[in-house]
Amino acid sequence: MDNFQGDLTDVVRGIGSGHVSPSPGPPEGPSPSSMSPPPTSDLHVEFPSAATSASCLANPFGDPFVSMKDPLIHLPASYISGAGDNKSNKSFAIFPKIFEDDHIKSQCSVFPRIKISQSNNIHDASTCNSPAITVSSAAVAASPWGMINVNTTNSPRNCLLVDNNNNTSSCSQVQISSSPRNLGIKRRKSQAKKVVCIPAPAAMNSRSSGEVVPSDLWAWRKYGQKPIKGSPYPRGYYRCSSSKGCSARKQVERSRTDPNMLVITYTSEHNHPWPTQRNALAGSTRSSSSSSLNPSSKSSTAAATTSPSSRVFQNNSSKDEPNNSNLPSSSTHPPFDAAAIKEENVEERQEKMEFDYNDVENTYRPELLQEFQHQPEDFFADLDELEGDSLTMLLSHSSGGGNMENKTTIPDVFSDFFDDDESSRSL
């Protein structure tokens, strides 16, 4: 047909024959070797030329955009790795990998991207220079957060790859070993313990629960008691009272197999020298030998604890009774029983108190004022004493008893009174 006019089939055939060049030859598309760098614009899009539109023949409507793919995907790798220093080329080189990676959703992510990959080998620090990691680090450069790449390996240690977002795109490898948690807890220092088994001494009192601990020349103070499971006897806890900073401890309990044996467990060592006998007996737990001490030591302690007034009374009694044979002498007599010594001390105190009371009555005189000290003793000597009570005298006269003299004297007095009255009337 002339001028390509006719039905629709002729039009389509005319379009295909007019645009297809039958001459063979190399394609006119750009080759990788002779390709010039694209312009610096980020919105650069290359459209296919008329010679490369042979693929559009399958489209019956001749739409050139239907079969067109993304031109950025088919760019060579040399162009991506050889991007310039300017920011526009660098940002343009980021887009292909972002489109190719399915995990990255957007370029400017506010939160860090955590990528977990399983491998059998621990990645070296040299893997940070790979193009994928370089592109990923550059992709999150605009984000204030970094990208953490966690590699779970078969080894017992877990490695964390943290990308430092700097201009050189260098990454540093931080390894955090999953060590056991109990290593940070300090164990208690192993203390030396010494166990001693000795026969249990008999209790001094009648109570069966009384615990008697033998003396070991150290001063101990009981600070606790705990019942033992399966044993009727408790366990006592003691600490050293000789020195304030001593860490020595001991535990006293009866043996489960033989109740007549004491099991003493010493913990730690004393950091001070041996105490004296006085300091050893200063604690609450005294040995049984302390109850049978000689009376001289007890009398000396009793004298040291007496008040000053009792000392004065003792001096007075010693002056009045220098030869007192009832007092026991500490050098000649053997040790007495504690109860007998206590009774003697009580009797001596009572005697001293009675003596002091009598002495006070004899020697005490109240101090009078000076104006009364020079008065004679016969101050009331000039006064006469009444022979009888006047009231009794009047009662005796009214009752009719008594002396006749008194009866006669009383009417005479009244008679004189009445006589004087009659004489005055007559005048």
From Swiss-Prot:
It holds the Pfam family WRKY. Residues 284-310 have a biased composition (Low complexity). Residues 1-45, 266-336 are annotated as: Disordered. Keywords: DNA-binding, Nucleus, Transcription, Transcription regulation. GO terms for biological process: embryo development ending in seed dormancy; pollen development. GO terms for molecular function: DNA-binding transcription factor activity; sequence-specific DNA binding. Residues 311-333 have a biased composition (Polar residues). InterPro entries: WRKY_dom, WRKY_dom_sf, WRKY_plant. The keyword Transcription regulation applies. It comes from the Eukaryota. It is found in: Nucleus. Residues 23-40 have a biased composition (Pro residues). Residues 209-275 bind DNA. GO terms for cellular component: nucleus. Its main location: nucleus. Gene3D superfamilies: WRKY domain. Transcription factor. Interacts specifically with the W box (5'-(T)TGAC[CT]-3'), a frequently occurring elicitor-responsive cis-acting element. Belongs to the WRKY group II-e family. This is Probable WRKY transcription factor 35. The gene is WRKY35.
